Amino acid sequence: MEALLIVILVATGVAVGLGQGLLGVGGAFIMVPVMVAVFEHMGWDRDPAVKIAFGTSLLVILPAAVATTAAHHRRGAIWWKAALVMGAAGAAGSLLGSTLTTRVIGGEIMKIVFGVVGLLASIRLVTARPKESPEPSPETPLLWAGVGFLVGLFSGLLGAGGGIVAVPLMVSVLRFRMHQAVATSAAVMVFTTGAGALGYFIHGQGVSGLPEGSFGYFYPVAWLCLAPTSIALTQVGTWALPRVSAGALRIAFALVMVAVGLHMIGLY
């Protein structure tokens, strides 16, 4: 891989880490388009480039989700009973999603779908403010499982953690308090990203024509460029959160997501 491409991926890891630490969202919606562009510049075909970007993205998000979950657990903020139910269902959904993307739908279509979802997510990032229910969260295991499965399906299909859909669903449908939803969502993402990454790895075994250096739908060089910087900068972003304007950051991050979404769709 060219030195410039490595620098681009490392810089992307910095941006992803800051975005996750400051806003709690956005990792995959920055990582995946950059990886696809880098892989295509390296001469890869679009279909494996998209699938490998999805699989690698999930494995970048996984350690960050583990670290975030540990921090929330130390504060006693996670509702573990709900997290385990949603996580188990989410793992099943993520495995199904990774199977659909790698075996049924294909990378060309999923690149466009990813772009559309990125545009919708950018709108939600700026405008949505889920309202908390004044009543305590009820224990509804079947509903937990349903929401977890949907979050996992989203995660596996698009190589994303799923937090951008999990938190509003937990608040509006499951009636979680916001802080409880954010913390529990991190725990659920450990299951969804782990299962999804495993699915992309397994479904990539024995596939002919994959680029040299990839293991299934996973590219270790990209992971090494993205994961350490994103994890480290997540802590910096968390530290900087009280010191910056969250509103301005949301708008700036949303504009970046719009730009990469339009690029993934193919409008420029």
Please report, for each region that a protein language model flagged, where it lies by residue.
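Juxtamembrane transmembrane-helix boundary motif
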Residues: 1-22, 30-51, 67-154, 172-173, ...
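Transmembrane helix boundary and interhelical junction motifs in multipass membrane proteins
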Residues: 24-34, 159-169
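Hydrophobic alpha-helical transmembrane segments that constitute the membrane-spanning cores
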Residues: 27, 194-199
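Transmembrane helix-bundle signature of multi-pass membrane transporters/permeases
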Residues: 54-61, 87, 91, 185-193, ...
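A structural-propensity feature for long, helix-poor, extended segments
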Residues: 62-64, 197, 216
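Small-residue-rich alpha-helical segments with characteristic i,i+4
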Residues: 169-191
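Generic hydrophobic alpha-helical scaffold/packing signal
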Residues: 182-185, 191, 195, 229, ...
